[in-house]
Amino acid sequence: MLGERPPESCARPYGDEQVIAFLEEQCGLSRAHPVPGRIFDTHDKALDFWLAQMEAGKLQPPFDVVHVDTHSDLAFGPPGTDFVLKAVLTRNPRARATLGAYREGKKLDEANYLLFALAFRWISRLAYVRNPKSHQDIPARLLDTEGNIRLQSDISVLMEAMNGREPTIPFEVFDDYRQFSETGYDFVTMAQSPRYAPASADRIMRLLKPYILET
């Protein structure tokens, strides 16, 4: 069960023209040259997609990620960051990406999947294009003094002799999507996110489809 859709009064999606302008002008996407990708029901399915592409030799970690969302998906709310920082980081990096076990233990969901991807050392750079009307939800403990992401905990530091030091991930936040501009994507994915997006937002999936080749 994915839960009930939030009421329309909670969020008003951008209009079709704004969405298309963002895809073409800010992201450099083209209907004439669609990019491989996929549309999911929930955000965390991106992990399964990335893993499948890596196993097929089509995606090499670590890779850059551009995250366009109202939420950071870095575990601001429950269950928080502790499990990833204290349990996942103590494991051998090559043995961390056990998605089924995390889901079965109710540790992984769509509100924290990017934190897991960072802990898997899949991401080399993260750009977050957020809704300026949303609340800031980036856990401060994930950031270093320069504002980049540096995952660690007291217990994970003790394991650095075996696992190596966790990488520093360049992290950039765009509060105004018009200030963002980046092209050259290898893959484009989108989540319907019915727990967080009203039904009227589903039309954005239809707007995106001409720009991707579902794979």
Could you describe each region identified by the protein language model?
Residues 2-215:
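Conserved alpha-helical scaffold segments that buttress catalytic/binding sites
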